Amino acid sequence: MKQEFIDLAKYRLKKARNTLSDAKKYINNATLESTVNRIYYAMFYAVNALLITKGLSSSKHSGVRAFFNKEFVNKGLVEEKLGEFYSDMFKRRQKGDYQDFVKFERQDVTEWLKKGEEFINRIERLTLKIIEEQK
């Protein structure tokens, strides 16, 4: 893998971590809708980093999800439950960002934040493993 792609993947992992850090601050200091947004985007940046290891990218969220499922979930490299959680967080983010009168429960968002961190940890480990194997 070219160094520029390694650098980009690592940058996106860092962006995922920073966005996750924002979500942890938001849970107590912002709306729950904003927290859901940050959880999803942290996961999105991590998945984008992973896709780079396969030379893949998409300008659309649906394309990122499709590549992620096709190349990693369906091939058994990422657990199916993580693929489902990523899709669920996309739907929740859409709902929170674009629908009126949405109300998330703090207990649910707190659980999603925990699962989001576990998701990012898993995707980061896999991304770095693939990078190391391709050196």
What name fits each language-model region?
Residues 1-135:
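Terminal alpha-helical segments
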